[in-house]
Amino acid sequence: MASESTNGKQARSHVTKGRRQYQHQHQQQQQQQQQVRSRSSVSECDGDDSFIFEANEAWKDFHGSLLGFYENGELCDVTLKVGSKLISCHKLVLACVIPYFRAMFLSEMSEAKQALIEIRDFDGDAVEDLVKFVYSSRLTLTVDNVQPLLYAACILQVELVARACCEYMQLHFHPSNCLAVRAFAESHNRIDLMDMADQYACEHFTEVVECEDFVSVSPQHLHKLLSSSDLNIDSEKQVYSAAIKWLLANPQHHPKWLDETLAQVRLPLLPVDFLMGVVAKEQIVKQNLKCRDLLDEARNYHLHLSSKPVPDFEYTVRTTPRKHTAGVLFCVGGRGGSGDPFRSIECYSINKNSWFFGPEMNSRRRHVGVISVEGKVYAVGGHDGNEHLGSMEMFDPLTNKWMMKASMNTKRRGIALASLGGPIYAIGGLDDNTCFSDVERYDIESDQWSTVAPMNTPRGGVGSVALINHVYAVGGNDGVASLSSVERYHPHLDKWIEVKEMGQRRAGNGVSELHGCLYVVGGFDDNSPLSSVERYDPRSNKWDYVAALTTPRGGVGIATVMGKIFAVGGHNGNAYLNTVEAFDPVLNKWELVGPVSHCRAGAGVAVCDCLTSQIRDVGHGSTNVVDCM
């Protein structure tokens, strides 16, 4: 017992000494912890003096060892038989990465205990490539192996590989193969690849239509393509031609799909001469009652546009242009926080939901009147920072240049422009001394201005639009206060007649037409910016309020694009705005869209009937880059 006690004391002394040595080492370890962490091995010390050592490098060794076992056929416990190919591997490794095998090996299935498992209806090379990926995390994709690999990855539920295959196939899309890839994706329920293929087909629609696969697409897929607003086309004629091409090649589908297919063509947007000279004479259209109804709808749309009465006419998706044919939204001039007017213009790409800078005007212009007529943009009057302007310039997308045109008789800012039957009307406005009731009419062909009957009330900062054979002047300021009154011009009578007034006084408001109604947006009630929006129906001579803007906007510019009203910039009482929002009349809701680059109010906004690709992007090098305050 004595000797045991003595040995115990010696042992305790040794442990105490060892503990002191360890504590010293522990302190050194703490000082070197950052260096240790920077290496592949990580160590930590807990409060109870325990020591945690983590070696990340070991995982690489582990991974490398597994790959070596596989390549050398060592310690394998299962062989996959795919056709004539035998693949020796490890159940545990397969179960870790491939959910299909995990479910198999953890179940009561007979295969769970078999050393040889036969897999039918797979490509042997594809399964072998997948197994190699399990061990190596590497996979080589080629145009030859990607489809069998995607099939195997989908069935075996290896989502990482399936996504990689989809992305690889996307990189190799071509007009001649995108429809076949889409059909392959649909057969394997790869929604992501289907969407990728559809997006590509829409972007390259006119090329895809010329390929052999086009007439072989399913009627359901054709329906989806033709209904898309994203079709990259120059004219709805191209969509009609594509539909007829497919229909003539697939008469077996006519009983169910003839009128359904033609209904996806936006016939109302076709020119009248094309409607009557081509569509109305097509035999398969003439012989189908529902197709004739669609043709009547298109005719009624054109009658409605010409202001002829059409009972029960309704706007539909077929009367809404597709994104590529909707025109380009221009934001022209205005001013920002510095007070200096802009000569810059910004153009909105509907597809990208973003703006880019187009060629600048010759003059700086704030509170400028802007309108688009026959595919050209006109900027009239305004103030250049030194004086009021009577000059006018025109932008032609074909030349990407602004050209000076005849000047108005009266120099003014805060004017509104409207076009009715060809001529452009310049309405109201003001200078430093006077609010004007003057109205001038510009004849585009002769490049001359003439005077027409003045309004009943002077209106500076007025809004205007042409609607059903009349030009409307909405709100404004008479030099004393903002106005709620509205009047309209009868060109045949050369006379202005007042109509029902708005519910809210406003000047510096935006005005646009949508679905046969007049919308007035924002503005100022004297100095107070407004978020309210009112709608006027000329058939009932009534105003009603619709959803308000997300923020007050005085000096806002508005225009209608693709069945929505866009409100651009303005001033909210504290700062100039670069935000843009769009109103959906179906949802009765405003939603923010892509902002302009420059905060600006008093800009002119209009939609030009041209293609975004026609406008030269001049980059961000504007002459007036300022903040919004």
Curated annotation (Swiss-Prot):
Q: Quick one: which pathway?
A: Protein modification; protein ubiquitination
Low complexity compositional bias: what residue ranges?
A: 24-35
Sequence positions bearing N-acetylalanine: 2
Ranges of biased composition (kind: Polar residues): 1-10
Domain BACK, chain residue ranges per copy = 178-279
Positions of the UniProt region annotated as Disordered: 1-40
Biological process per Gene Ontology, one example term = ubiquitin-dependent protein catabolic process
Assembly information from the UniProt record: Component of the BCR(KLHL8) E3 ubiquitin ligase complex, at least composed of CUL3, KLHL8 and RBX1. Interacts with RAPSN.
Q: What is this protein called?
A: Kelch-like protein 8
